[in-house]
Amino acid sequence: MDKVKVAIIGSGNIGTDLMMKTLRSSSLEMAVLVGVDPRSDGLARAERLGIATTSGGLDHFVTTPEFEDVAIVFDATSAAAHERHASILAQLNKQVVDLTPAAVGPYVIPTVNMDRVVGEPNVNMVTCGGQATVPIVAAISGVTPVHYAEIVASIASRSAGPGTRANIDEFTETTALALESVGGATQGKAIIVLNPAEPPLIMRDTVLCLCDEADETEIEAAVERMVASVAEFVPGYRLKQKVQFQRYTRNSPLRLPEQEADFTGLQVSVFLEVEGAAHYLPAYAGNLDIMTSAALRTAERMTELDAIRGK
């Protein structure tokens, strides 16, 4: 089967890492890298690899001969930029995989809902924190109702480029919504920390869920199965320690300032780390790896299901 040609908009950290992964794909062909900064390392690297490039942004890319041959467009720019890109690409009948928090299309978490939404013309990969934590919330909510899910994603400051920094507010909003709509939590909250420590620290994620009483061994098994599923395409994704449990009873409830009633039930805490494959940035940048690996897996699944718009 012929490979499907793809283009990536955004020549920063995420776009360049995705480019390096796409070059390894058995079903996708890296056709064009699109940027706006002619001095960017991503564009220079693409040129050295013999990949077509443009520093004229999407506006110039759509006028080039290569555009017609591209079936899937990855957008690795910013939420604000994607709002405009989505409209242009929709009019031109291109399949879009959005790696920004813009969330124009439905959220995609490969291990949770990928096959249900890959047929949509524009799909959203949530955020790096969402890709790491929503699967865990979904695993727990598959065992017992999750009333509240809170996640903290800590990433190395050095791994966060201009696009990521511009998206901080959208990161928290989009991740929280995905915890609810895909993860199954009644209420979600997300926090991101850009850790400036040197040497840079590996990506760490904490997931805290308040849920109904349930069998702890069943929850732990569900979490471990989900971790194994994610690790199939993100090998550096793993549990940092065993799943932690704490029970709150009527005699010792958990007082929540934002809730009218005290919480009684089970608190589940899951601690994760994500080591990158170092295809572009070093292994500490697991936040890049999980985002780009999820996007690549989604696009490859589109080719498997022949669910590419305009084909």
From Swiss-Prot:
Enzyme class name: oxidoreductase
UniProt keyword annotation of Oxidoreductase present: yes
Keyword Ligase: no
Active site location: C128
GO MF term (any one): acetaldehyde dehydrogenase (acetylating) activity
Alphabetical list of SMART domains matching this protein: Semialdhyde_dh (SM00859)
EC number: 1.2.1.10
One of the Pfam families matching this protein, by short name: AcetDehyd-dimer
InterPro entries: Acetaldehyde_dehydrogenase, Acetylaldehyde_DH_C, NAD(P)-bd_dom_sf, Semialdehyde_DH_NAD-bd
Keywords carried by this UniProt record: Aromatic hydrocarbons catabolism, NAD, Oxidoreductase
Protein's GO biological process: catabolic process
Binding of NAD(+), residues: S11, G12, N13, I14, S159, A160, G161, P162, G163, T164, R165, A166, N167, N287
Catalytic activity: acetaldehyde + NAD(+) + CoA = acetyl-CoA + NADH + H(+)
Family: Belongs to the acetaldehyde dehydrogenase family.
The protein, known as: Acetaldehyde dehydrogenase 1
